[in-house]
Amino acid sequence: MLPDCLSAEGELRCRRLLAGATARLRARPASAAVLVPLCSVRGVPALLYTLRSSRLTGRHKGDVSFPGGKCDPADQDVVHTALRETREELGLAVPEEHVWGLLRPVYDPQKATVVPVLAGVGPLDPQSLRPNSEEVDEVFALPLAHLLQTQNQGYTHFCRGGHFRYTLPVFLHGPHRVWGLTAVITEFALQLLAPGTYQPRLAGLTCSGAEGLARPKQPLASPCQASSTPGLNKGL
């Protein structure tokens, strides 16, 4: 059963769980930050995503992501980075007091630290947003109920030269596939927002503050033979 994460009690629970990590992480330098916007779309709890512009340069163009970007020297901390980038990309101004806390940092292939910032942005119609077309092609929301359905969850094994490198979650059957670091951050958010409902299968992918809430399921088998494992996708 999906808990009422949009209630005042749900928000307070999440804030308390994230308080320790938030105090530590806000004081640390990072390369980038993203906002994880928890919203209500026609009364349904959802996470807000962007589809990066296909006109951008770099390997991540056209990927699903959360709004965010590199830290600027003028930013006070990672929270201000996430809020500034969200305003620039989506035209969405999120007050700092709507930030619930910081999730566990993730690291891109260049070992840069990316800090996810969870915020409650309230009722929202994604179609009413006017994103910056130079950075964003599309804005869409995925209900938490959709993300929590096992048929919409999978795992991608990344192999190179026949050798296993790593495995990451992937969320399927929405407007666009959610994968890579965005899927990892989504997994962290689900552990926090739906304790006992979402059970990650990857040891080590546990959100700060949710260590006692989610226990990884049985580890995945056959890392470089994902095609023989039901529900998995093989990444290259």
Curated annotation (Swiss-Prot):
Entry EC number(s): 3.6.1.-, 3.6.1.77
Main location as per UniProt: mitochondrion
EC category name: hydrolase
Example GO molecular function: magnesium ion binding
GO biological process, one term: medium-chain fatty-acyl-CoA catabolic process
Subcellular location: Mitochondrion
Cofactor(s), by name: Mg(2+); Mn(2+)
Keyword Secreted applies: no
Domain Nudix hydrolase: 25-172
Family matches, as SUPFAM superfamilies: Nudix (SSF55811)
Catalytic activity: an acyl-CoA + H2O = an acyl-4'-phosphopantetheine + adenosine 3',5'-bisphosphate + 2 H(+); CoA + H2O = (R)-4'-phosphopantetheine + adenosine 3',5'-bisphosphate + 2 H(+); acetyl-CoA + H2O = S-acetyl-4'-phosphopantetheine + adenosine 3',5'-bisphosphate + 2 H(+); butanoyl-CoA + H2O = S-butanoyl-4'-phosphopantetheine + adenosine 3',5'-bisphosphate + 2 H(+)
Domain of life: Eukaryota
Residue ranges annotated as motif Nudix box: 70-91
Signal peptide: none
Keyword annotations: Hydrolase, Magnesium, Manganese, Metal-binding, Mitochondrion
Any single Gene Ontology cellular-component annotation: mitochondrion
InterPro entries according to UniProt: CoAse, NUDIX_hydrolase-like_dom_sf, NUDIX_hydrolase_dom
Binding-site positions, Mg(2+): 85, 89
UniProt similarity note: Belongs to the Nudix hydrolase family.
UniProt function note: Acyl-CoA diphosphatase that mediates the hydrolysis of a wide range of CoA and CoA esters yielding 3',5'-ADP and the corresponding 4'-phosphopantetheine derivative as products. Hydrolyzes short- and medium-chain acyl-CoAs, exhibiting the highest activity toward free CoA, hexanoyl-CoA, and octanoyl-CoA and the lowest activity against acetyl-CoA. Exhibits decapping activity towards dpCoA-capped RNAs in vitro.
Subunit record text: Monomer.
Protein name: Mitochondrial coenzyme A diphosphatase NUDT8
